């Protein structure tokens, strides 16, 4: 087997993966875009079974910090809109990215409150509480590190419930503190809850679309418990009423999409119930309900939870809750993507440019792979040296395929040649290639990250297709510089068009990934020449001009 046949192996692996990816998407199709109708009712057998309320109408207040711009409904105190000023919606735009939204076309909210027997958010106790607030707009002032937004509600019995949002400068984690003052003569039983609800279908302004060959990051729900560090839960599964019902101490529930996430983290020592629910009207939910707390007459009870609403910044998320950083979707190759990202981030701390960091990490990866690359070319050279003997054996044995196979294996053993030695290094490199793809598509740090010249976003395709063309050129040179024993006309035609085929594939790939492949090909050319010189000294390679 020679290096050109190895390109066929790469193509087979690559196309096979793309077919598998397409099959996964067909098996779990995304529903067609449709209009979502806001509703104040809850589907039977869903969140109502948890004593969790539906949405309601109230006054909207705004809260602005240096990193968050939220809209909170005083009816229940739900976060109904979240803008992220530090992250533009599109490259070059002044419009901030919108994470949470409440419109006729799309619903994505972070709900929270107090349920339980005496909780004001329990549907059995009437409409959700209409909180009183001091003002309609809260702003984190310059020089201020913390902003508190207190909301109070007093029920007919004179019990006072206070819900306070606590924001900190530069932080996407929002603490929600509850205070329950029991003015009656009987204990009050309340439970905190946190629920994330979202329309399954994406409206046009949120559906960014995808290229024909792009891999897709996960959009859906997830949860974590001490026993199950990270489990995904598809929206389609919830919509089919195959719902989650797990009890756990600690953990969190979340909704994920590319680069961004929302999560509720209960802060208590008791047991929490994690659930999902189909709310009807194309809306699904994931949430938690905490173990009930008793507040004695004349006493004040305190409870708290934390809402994460923002980008998937791994180190910050890990500091908020165990395993919350796992929400960064690196796919099934996360065990390779994670260390690659940590290495890339460490390099970036020195060079300050993600593009140059990718170039450096390419040299590191190819340096580590060099022994395998050398073994690959050595194996291919030995296979070429055996071709005359193999051809003579085939002529001698004619159509006796069984004897041909037996004698060929004996020849490989005698000459100490592994017929698969040329493929193995390539098979190892494919997971690294795909892991880098997932890393580029899942790491918020690389979103809108510029490199140089016309490349302003390493996570997006090259707008002028220059990098894919350069990649095809480097692939062409590698092919022309590689000795070949391919004699089959069909294989020769395939090999001729292989650089063109790969160039077409790479047109829609992230420019950071194409940059990696270009540099990798250039390193391959250099390593190839160094290895060939060593093989020449051993009589395993000749600089004869390659036959066309």
Curated annotation (Swiss-Prot):
Gene3D superfamilies with a match to the protein in the record: 2.70.98.90
Compositionally skewed regions (Low complexity) per UniProt: 29-42
Stretches the record annotates as Disordered: 28-56
Subcellular location: Cell inner membrane
Protein family according to the UniProt entry: Belongs to the OXA1/ALB3/YidC family. Type 1 subfamily.
Record keywords, A-Z: Cell inner membrane, Cell membrane, Chaperone, Membrane, Protein transport, Transmembrane, Transmembrane helix, Transport
GO cellular component terms attached to this protein's record: plasma membrane
Chain's gene name: yidC
Assembly and oligomerization: Interacts with the Sec translocase complex via SecD. Specifically interacts with transmembrane segments of nascent integral membrane proteins during membrane integration.
Protein known as: Membrane protein insertase YidC
Superkingdom as given in the UniProt entry: Bacteria
